A protein has these predicted regions:
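Active-site loop-to-helix "anion-binding N-cap" substructures in soluble metabolic enzymes
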Residues: 1-177
Length: 177
């Protein structure tokens, strides 16, 4: 299956562990994880929304379906905090940008604190004039998620190490002679 092969190629050696982690999280938090009910396939350069039950298909699945987009947008509107990392679909193709644009609009309309992460997301939020309605916009997608998860970021670690190393020299009184 085309979409399965795409995931295997993207995740490489991490494919099986990622699938197992996803299954475990879904089992542990079934009321917190919303899976799509439909997806948009690119069939002969046309958007065709397909129910999950109609899968698999030998066509790229490159956006959320309309029903899933509505469900995600509704969930966003009642959220207290939103962390979004990356577009929902292949937004460069107008027919497959619907999920992304609607989700960004829902984030902007929500009263929640919204963190937008990733270069594509930051570009789109700016393009559609939504940046001022978000709590934070960062071009660092994976780095933003790592920071939120409490992981050490190499750049921050280097700055902290540098501050420790040079703090003594910076704060020493200078001898006027």
């Amino acid at each position: 299956d085309l979409n399965h092969n795409f995931l295997v190629n993207e995740l490489g050696d991490n494919y099986h562990s990622t699938v197992e982690t996803a299954k475990s999280l879904l089992a542990d938090f079934p009321d917190k994880i919303h899976l799509p009910v439909d997806l948009a396939a690119n069939i002969e350069d046309n958007r065709v929304d397909l129910l999950i039950d109609d899968l698999p298909v030998e066509a790229p699945l490159i956006d959320l379906g309309i029903q899933s987009t509505i469900a995600v947008s509704t969930a966003i509107k009642s959220a207290g905090t939103i962390i979004l990392n990356g577009p929902a679909g292949v937004f460069e193709l107008p027919d497959f940008s619907l999920g992304t644009i609607e989700i960004l609009n829902a984030c902007a309309e929500s009263d929640a604190y919204a963190v937008m992460g990733g270069g594509h997301t930051a570009t789109l939020v700016t393009k559609y004039g939504l940046a001022s309605k978000m709590g934070h916009v960062s071009t660092g997608g994976g780095a933003s998620l790592d920071y939120i998860a409490g992981r050490t970021l190499p750049g921050i670690a280097s700055l902290e190490a540098s501050a420790k190393q040079f703090a003594v020299e910076i704060t020493k009184p200078v001898d006027p002679q």
